[in-house]
Amino acid sequence: MEEAFGQGNTNVIDEVLHSEFVCYDPNSESGEIRGADTIKGEIEYFRNAVPDLTYTVEDQVAEGDKVVTRYTTRGTHQREFFGVAGTGNRVEFTGIQIDRFDKSGKMVEEWPEYDLLGAMRQMGAIPEAQQPGS
């Protein structure tokens, strides 16, 4: 996924994902993103909004058929992203995901959590929180 998100090489998606792949993304309309083509579309959407997007794996832990990845995404918000027109603001947000793999090494399921609120604040869509007493 680092190559797909960070470099825009969505061809690796077909090599990595199982044909019945499901991503349980709480930020998607239905809560689920199914299939390689849909994931490719999501990556293209992110990279269109943030063309200089980087995706850095900070840490990974594997146990059994699951891998947990902690990552940081950085870039410049140039085009519409989650309803927010491009601002030119630098955006950096972190995330963590749990991926489950089958015996052949294909990713079958994913449960991501990422700091969309922080990204929206950096884009200027949501005001920064005020400290009590300020």
Task: Kindly give the residue locations of the regions a language model identified.
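C-terminal and inter-domain tail/linker signature
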Residues: 1-134
